[in-house]
Curated annotation (Swiss-Prot):
Major location (coarse): membrane
Single GO molecular function: ATP hydrolysis activity
Short name of any one Pfam family annotated for the protein: ATP-synt_VA_C
EC number annotated for this UniProt entry: 7.1.2.2
Protein name: ATP synthase subunit beta
Gene3D superfamilies referenced in this protein's UniProt entry, alphabetically: 2.40.10.170, Bovine Mitochondrial F1-atpase, Atp Synthase Beta Chain, Chain D, domain 3, P-loop containing nucleotide triphosphate hydrolases
GO cellular component, one term: plasma membrane
Gene behind this protein: atpD
UniProt-listed InterPro entries: AAA+_ATPase (IPR003593), ATP-synt_VA_C (IPR055190), ATP_synth_F1_bsu (IPR005722), ATPase_a/bsu_AS (IPR020003), ATPase_alpha/beta_chains (IPR050053), ATPase_F1/V1/A1_a/bsu_N (IPR004100), ATPase_F1/V1/A1_a/bsu_N_sf (IPR036121), ATPase_F1/V1/A1_a/bsu_nucl-bd (IPR000194)
Provenance organism: Paramagnetospirillum magneticum (strain ATCC 700264 / AMB-1) (Magnetospirillum magneticum)
């Protein structure tokens, strides 16, 4: 123990632990280790209090922790196992496996705190990432190496959409993915793991797994939830920087990262800012988001679920996230109530790459025409509610009819929801999506019933469904 820097615990306040060091004080963000109930407990230094005491945040429960316990300074930040050995495994915030399948066997570890790539190392190419989901590919397309946000209140389908994207992109993409479960339901994390095993994305009996899972779920203390996104990102950065891969990085949910940060901030006694959030909200978010970027070696495309408290998009937590995103997919409760899934709002969702120079004129024009029709329908809804459809002009009636068909055609059965809905999932090629919407806008399918457009894949299925409906009616 002679060369180790050892301190003793002087105070335990929930997740906050004060430690006194007689020798040198550990640096801020250093990891401290101690034995607690037969397990390793990690504390991260957050503040220096006076000459000999540090205030730390615990990464696990502090129940049963007593004053006087010895703590060892590691002299470095929390270290995360990285490399191909992490694929197919579930790891917690401090890099320990939690899937009961033995040690990870990694050869390399990296600290979870790192600088963002230098300005000169970043890549600026723009290319569309096809998801196979009609509403996204047409109206708010994702960009390779970009940041994508899925925003919505509770229970509108963020996690289902993220799981469908993992299913569609991770399988078609062939590269590696990293999933960071930040403060979400343990049940969903468990479901995701077993679904990945069933679909072959994770292989239990040998190499070939394509995804690493890093979990810090709702039941974890705030310290773990505030750091698990960084732990997951460290695994993804290794694949980008060392192996030159194009990595997919999924975060569910980025709001919980902010929420945990606000809990930690309050425990540390900082004065809160707007709506009770931490004063360092923008700094914390920037430190995470700036590391998620594409370099000349490889790229990280990140898909982040963003919980919107009380469906208020102006809340500081989602509003701070938006500043960093290339595309936002907004999920709307009113659309979910109509039974249209994915409940993506076609007018609120935005994308930086919906630009004729990136997607081409045909795609751009079709998307804008679809939005124009939907916007006109939205502005006519008050008149329809008060006076009824009969008071509209013939031209407006036609717009409403097409808008309702477009609205239904934006729905789509998902592979991951097959077990609930019983209808097989559909993956639609982007050319088919553009062709279908272009034809609806042009009025080529004005004669088909609205119901034929609901929960189908491409436009050919609409025609089939309409024939079937006509045959049944006859």
């Amino acid at each position: 123990m002679a060369n180790k820097n050892v301190g003793t615990i002087t105070q335990v306040l929930g997740a906050v632990v004060d430690v006194r060091f007689d020798g040198q004080l550990p640096a801020i963000l250093s990891a401290l280790h101690l034995e607690h109930q037969g397990k390793k407990l990690v504390l991260e230094v957050a503040q220096h209090l006076g000459e000999s005491t540090v205030r730390t945040i615990a990464m696990d429960s502090t129940d049963g922790l007593t004053r006087g316990t010895e703590v060892v300074d590691t002299g470095a930040a929390i270290q995360m196992p990285v490399g191909p050995e992490t694929l197919g495994r579930i790891i917690n915030v401090i890099g320990e496996p939690i899937d009961e399948r033995g040690p990870i066997g990694n050869k390399t570890t990296l600290p979870i705190h790192a600088d963002a790539p230098e300005f000169v190392d970043q890549s600026t190419e723009t290319e569309i990432l096809v998801t196979g989901i009609k509403v996204i590919d047409l109206l708010a397309p994702y960009c390779k190496g970009g940041k994508i946000g899925l925003c919505g209140g509770a229970g509108v389908g963020k996690t289902v959409l993220i799981m469908e994207l993992i299913n569609n992109i991770a399988k078609a993409h062939g590269g590696y993915s990293v999933f960071a479960g930040v403060g979400e339901r343990t049940r969903e994390g468990n479901d995701l793991y077993h679904e990945m095993i069933e679909s072959g994305v994770i292989k239990l009996d040998g190499p070939g797994s394509k995804v690493a899972l890093v979990y810090g779920q709702m039941n974890e203390p705030p310290g773990a939830r505030a750091r698990v996104a960084l732990s997951g990102l460290t695994v993804a950065e290794y694949f980008r920087d060392v192996e030159g891969q194009d990595v997919l990085f999924f975060v569910d949910n980025i709001f919980r990262f902010t929420q945990a940060g606000s809990e930690v901030s309050a425990l540390l006694g900082r004065i809160p800012s707007a709506v009770g959030y931490q004063p360092t909200l923008a700094t914390d978010m920037g430190a995470l988001q700036e590391r998620i970027t594409s370099t000349k070696k490889g790229s990280i495309t990140s898909v982040q679920a963003i919980y919107v408290p009380a469906d208020d998009l102006t809340d500081p937590a989602p509003a701070t996230s938006f500043a960093h995103l290339d595309a936002t997919t907004v999920l709307n409760r009113q659309i979910a109530e109509l039974g249209i899934y994915p409940a993506v709002d076609p007018l609120d969702s935005t994308s930086r790459v919906l630009d004729p120079r990136v997607v081409g004129n045909d795609h751009y024009q079709t998307a804008r025409d679809v939005q124009r029709i939907l916007q006109t329908y939205k502005s006519l809804q008050d008149i329809i509610a008060i006076l009824g459809m009969d008071e509209l002009s013939e031209e407006d009636k036609l717009v409403v009819s097409r808008a309702r068909k477009i609205q239904r055609f934006l729905s789509q059965p998902f592979h991951v929801a097959e077990i609930f809905t019983g209808s097989p999932g559909k993956l639609v090629a982007i050319d088919d999506t553009i062709k279908g919407f272009k034809a609806i806008v042009a009025g080529e399918y004005d004669h088909l019933p609205e119901a034929a457009f609901y929960m189908v894949g491409g436009i050919d299925e609409v025609i089939e469904k309409a024939k079937k409906m006509a045959a049944e009616a006859a």
